[in-house]
Every structure is written in structure tokens, then in C-alpha cells.
Design a protein with these regions (language model features):
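A short hydrophobic beta-strand element within the catalytic core of glycosyltransferases
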Residues: 145-146
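Extended catalytic core of nucleotide-activated donor transferases of GT-like folds
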Residues: 1-53, 60-64
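Conserved catalytic-core segment of nucleotide-activated headgroup transferases in glycan assembly
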Residues: 81-135
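Donor nucleotide-sugar binding/catalytic pocket of nucleotide-sugar-dependent glycosyltransferases
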Residues: 52-63, 71-87
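Aromatic "clamp/platform" in nucleotide-sugar-dependent glycosyltransferases that forms part
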Residues: 150
Length: 245
């Protein structure tokens, strides 16, 4: 055994599994990059005495670990990674940035049609199809963001949008179904959120009313403050240190 006061395996893959066999088990913290459906995840489910804590990136993921994998609540802690608090000055050149990830094309088409009906200009980014610098430029130039997103265990890109001070109208979803009916659980595309971030709706029939409210109070949102208060590097480090202790 290698002797350390704390042992932290951020990602649990073949390399981490090998490392795991050489460290003190009673101080071992694992996650949040854990996939309980693979061989290494199954090992953690079957050997709960081999680690002190498993980390979930958000509350709904913790609930999934408990309710679908029968992991004890006292074994699971929630820790989101820190988000940079950008010191940007917004340079607005168009109305809406559409952020699209793992949703149906017809939902995207409905949003585009809605924005067209309001004579609003928009640009779109799709997950996996952008570079970091180009993404930040598009975010900084947008008056607001329209989020059409699948479930997120944390939602780092979304939180970077918030951190740049861009209000969001989010077409949220209520369940995680990625692994089929047996693992259906309540979930969300915005696991870190409060009223400072923007507005949320779940059904296309709610869009018109929600959007009217969003536009009427657009200048009152402060997503940058939400990130600073909840997901800054300082907040993230404090939470992690509390878990390690």
C-alpha cells in the first residue's frame, strides 16, 4: 500500500482500478467520472468497503446511485467541478445563441420557427461541433441563450454560458432514459440553477408565456453571480476538502 492522508481517483477506469489496488482503502475517494454500467463500476458496487466515498456530480445522479444501484446514501457525496468566473465585458451583436445537445431535431426546428416568428437573430452551437475560443466568442456576443439539451450530470458548458453573464431560457426535461426503462430516474438538463439564471419550461405549449416573462425581465437575471456563489473554483475546492475530511 502507498500511504497518503487522502487518496482521490477522479476517473475510475482501468488505470485507476490498478492504482486502487495499491492505496489505502479507508481514505479513498472515487469520482465523479464513474460509469456504474461498466466492469469497473460494477466492481465498486460489489465492493463498497473498498472506498470511503463515491462522488456524484449532482443531486439527481446521487439519487440514481442510491435508488437504482442500492448504494448507501452515506457513501455518496455531491461535488461539481469548479467553473471559471469570467471577467468578460459582453459585446452583444445578435439576439439568441441556441445550445443544442442530444435532443430531437423537431424540437430544434420548433425553437427556430419560434425565434423567426419574433424576428430574432440567432446562431447555434451543437455539442461536439465547436472549439473553446469560438464558443466563448459566440456566447459573449449573444443577448440570451436558448437551451435545448439532454440531461446533464453537471452541465459544464451550460455553466460557462452562465459564467459569462448570459441569461438562459431552458427547455428542460424531467427524466433520464439513456439505459432504458429499468433505469428511468428523475433528472434535468440544468442540475445547478436558480431564478437568477433565467426561465425554465418543459412543454412547447408553455414556450410563449415563458418567453414573454423571460424577455420582460431579461435585464434582471444575474447568472454570473449564481456561478460565483455556487460553482466557482473556490466553492468547488471547499466542497471537495469537506468531502476529503
Amino acid at each position: 500500500e502507498e500511504k497518503y492522508e487522502h487518496n482521490f481517483l477522479l476517473q475510475y477506469n482501468d488505470i485507476a482500478h490498478e492504482k486502487h489496488s495499491k492505496i489505502e482503502l479507508d481514505t479513498c475517494i472515487i469520482g465523479p467520472q464513474v460509469w456504474l454500467f461498466d466492469t469497473y463500476g460494477q466492481f465498486l458496487i460489489e465492493h463498497q468497503d473498498y472506498y470511503k466515498k463515491m462522488i456524484a456530480p449532482s443531486q439527481w445522479v446521487k439519487d440514481k446511485f442510491i435508488n437504482k444501484f442500492n448504494l448507501p446514501e452515506n457513501k455518496i457525496s455531491v461535488w461539481p467541478v469548479g467553473i471559471e468566473t469570467f471577467n468578460n465585458e459582453r459585446d452583444i451583436t445578435y439576439d439568441c445563441l441556441i445550445y443544442f445537445k442530444r435532443r430531437e431535431q423537431k424540437e430544434l426546428d420548433a425553437v427556430k420557427q419560434f425565434l423567426d416568428s419574433k424576428n430574432l437573430t440567432y446562431k447555434m452551437v451543437e455539442y461536439g461541433g465547436y472549439g473553446e475560443d469560438g464558443f466563448k466568442d459566440l456566447v459573449n456576443q449573444a443577448k440570451f441563450c436558448f437551451l435545448i439539451n439532454g440531461t446533464e450530470s453537471q452541465g459544464i458548458a451550460v455553466q460557462e454560458i452562465m459564467s459569462m453573464g448570459v441569461p438562459i431560457i431552458a427547455w428542460d426535461i424531467k427524466e433520464w432514459l439513456d439505459q432504458g426503462e429499468a433505469y428511468r430516474v428523475p433528472a434535468t438538463s440544468i442540475p445547478y440553477w436558480d431564478e437568477r439564471c433565467g426561465e425554465v419550461f418543459f412543454n412547447i405549449d408553455e414556450l410563449d408565456v415563458t418567453f414573454s416573462k423571460f424577455c420582460a425581465t431579461l435585464d434582471e437575471y444575474d447568472p454570473k453571480a449564481f456561478i460565483k456563489d455556487n460553482l466557482s473554483f473556490e466553492c468547488s475546492v471547499k466542497t471537495l476538502l469537506d468531502i476529503l475530511r
